């Protein structure tokens, strides 16, 4: 055999093996051959990995659907289905589908609620945290959300007074940075009993520890989270590559793997601080970590330190850049759409007492136009833009979706960005920002069912109630107390990791007197 490899025929043998490596998966799934695929997507996962690495997977997949139709094969086993009629079939209760091996790339420390693929394990984990996020339970969180937004307002008032341009009256800032500081401090408060301190210091930083006993170091948490999301989503296209990623010549992977470790270290540091005996003895708050400590593992025992930290990490990730990205997108779309901010001023001034700076949730939760603005931003921006992959497990009967039959081992997804901008669903103005489309008198049942910013079914976002409360209070505060001017040209640029995030939003900001025209 060695002689053959070293002979002139060795190169041909190697080439033949390489061809077979990519051809066999294609031949094995003959039932998928009639589904069109861009480039080499039908033969190799590397096509999708490359699109994800470039940070615009959602655009490439959307363009593929515009070219080929509702069914597009984006990997040898993976079919993207741009059909709102497929949402319940893919993500709904009772279909038996599992999260695909894409989620293996997101595992750090220990499998958590987000990345576990086992149905029984997910049920156990979700039971531990779901009651924490009920509408009844989140009422006790509001005071901590409120306190952080008050500090946010204090800092913006300070900048409005000390950094204003004497000619325009506006202070210049990157709004995304401040929404990041706010979101991280809120989730720090809710999950670990204390904020990170980003708002107070006006910068991105967090303590991290490799182990509970190791000395602390400090990292930029927002940057770490962004890099982790990008590399994990990329490696999710080829999970077997993860153990070797840091050895690849592209520094994107090396830096990304370091970010995965750093983000885990942030969770280790926060859990370590929260579990210190003196903190435990004096703690009277029911934060998310306290709820997690009440949970049981698969043996009925209290969660071990590793699993507890992994679940805390899940909450940190889920509750930070999702809120900041959406808040930034709301400001951007409201600023670029004439008349929206003026309507917000009117409804907010009417609903909130003049002597109140930061409204309570009760003051803003029933303002229709404010809710419409938030929903419309979630539709047109789609923070979670990619199709979340689900695998048909072994033993499952064949399933027909959108006119095509899929078999065990196949992976399917519904791309939310494409669904949320479909003119067939939303009408000819689908790519325009129109809050009024959410008026119940105008909204159709089909549109309501096609709106999936938090996904749907048993793996839907468990923290939806908290997220919606945060966004209502943040937006109710920001648009009522401040005026803005756009200080950047062109559209707001975004980059996609696991989430689609803005790259910045440069604006001018000044105080507004509530009640003024």
Curated annotation (Swiss-Prot):
Q: Name one GO molecular function term.
A: heme binding
| Domain of life according to the entry | Eukaryota
Q: Which SUPFAM superfamilies match?
A: Cytochrome P450 (SSF48264)
What residues bind heme, as annotated? Answer: 461
Looking up CDD domains in the UniProt record yields: CYP67-like
Recount the UniProt induction comment for this entry: Expression is induced in the presence of caffeic acid, p-coumaric acid, p-hydroxybenzoic acid, protocatechuic acid, and benzoic acid.
Q: Where is the signal peptide?
A: none
What chemistry does it catalyse, as a reaction equation?
benzoate + reduced [NADPH--hemoprotein reductase] + O2 = 4-hydroxybenzoate + oxidized [NADPH--hemoprotein reductase] + H2O + H(+)
Which GO cellular component terms, listed alphabetically, does the Swiss-Prot or TrEMBL entry include? intracellular membrane-bounded organelle; membrane
- Provide the topology term for how it sits in the membrane: Single-pass membrane protein
Q: What is its EC number?
A: 1.14.14.92
Cofactor(s) listed in the protein's UniProt record: heme
- Which key words tag this protein in UniProt? Glycoprotein, Heme, Iron, Membrane, Metal-binding, Monooxygenase, Oxidoreductase, Transmembrane, Transmembrane helix
Protein name as annotated: Benzoate 4-monooxygenase bphA
């Amino acid at each position: 055999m060695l002689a053959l490899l070293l002979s002139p025929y060795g190169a041909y043998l190697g080439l033949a093996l390489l061809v077979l490596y990519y051809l066999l998966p294609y031949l094995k799934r003959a039932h998928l051959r009639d589904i069109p695929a861009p480039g080499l997507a039908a033969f190799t996962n590397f096509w999708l990995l490359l699109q994800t690495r470039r940070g615009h997977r959602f655009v490439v997949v959307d363009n593929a659907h515009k070219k080929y139709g509702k069914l597009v094969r984006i990997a040898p086993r993976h079919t993207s289905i741009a059909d709102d009629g497929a949402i319940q079939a893919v993500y709904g209760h009772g279909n038996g589908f599992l999260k695909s091996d894409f989620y293996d790339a997101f595992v750090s420390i220990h499998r958590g609620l987000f990345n576990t693929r086992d149905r029984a394990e997910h049920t156990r984990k979700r039971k531990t945290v779901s009651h924490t996020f009920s509408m009844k339970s989140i009422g006790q969180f509001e005071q901590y959300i409120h306190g952080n937004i008050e500090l946010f307002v204090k800092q913006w008032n300070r900048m409005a007074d000390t950094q204003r341009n004497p000619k325009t009256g506006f202070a210049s800032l990157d709004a995304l940075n401040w929404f990041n500081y706010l979101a991280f401090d809120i989730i720090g408060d809710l999950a670990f009993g204390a904020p990170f301190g980003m708002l107070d210091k006006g910068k991105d930083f967090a303590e991290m520890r490799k182990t509970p006993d190791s000395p602390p170091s400090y990292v930029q948490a927002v940057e770490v989270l962004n890099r982790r999301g990008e590399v994990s989503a990329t490696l999710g296209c080829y999970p077997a590559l993860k153990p070797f990623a840091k050895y690849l010549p592209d520094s994107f992977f090396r830096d990304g793997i370091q970010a995965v470790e750093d983000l885990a270290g942030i969770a280790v540091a926060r859990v370590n601080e929260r579990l210190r005996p003196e903190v435990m003895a004096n703690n009277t708050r029911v934060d998310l970590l306290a709820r997690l400590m009440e949970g049981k593992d698969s043996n009925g025992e209290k969660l071990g330190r590793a699993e507890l930290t992994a679940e805390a990490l899940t909450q940190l990730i889920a509750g930070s850049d999702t809120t900041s990205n959406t808040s930034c997108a709301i400001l951007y779309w409201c600023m670029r759409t004439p008349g929206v901010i003026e309507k917000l001023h009117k409804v907010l001034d009417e609903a909130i007492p003049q002597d109140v700076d930061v409204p309570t949730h009760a003051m803003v939760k029933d303002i229709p136009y404010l809710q419409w603005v938030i929903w419309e931003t979630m539709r047109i921006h789609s923070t979670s833009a990619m199709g979340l992959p689900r695998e048909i497990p072994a033993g499952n009967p064949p399933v027909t979706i959108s006119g095509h039959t899929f078999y065990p081992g196949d992976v399917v997804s519904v791309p939310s960005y494409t669904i949320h901008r479909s003119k067939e669903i939303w009408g000819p103005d689908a790519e325009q920002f129109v809050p009024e489309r959410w008026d119940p008198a105008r909204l159709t049942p089909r549109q309501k069912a096609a709106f999936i910013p938090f996904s749907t079914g048993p793996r839907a976002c468990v923290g939806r109630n908290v997220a919606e409360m945060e966004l209502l209070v943040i937006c109710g505060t920001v648009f009522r107390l401040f005026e803005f001017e756009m200080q950047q040209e062109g559209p707001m640029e975004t980059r996609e990791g696991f989430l689609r995030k803005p790259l910045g939003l440069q604006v001018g900001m000044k105080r507004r007197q509530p009640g003024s025209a």
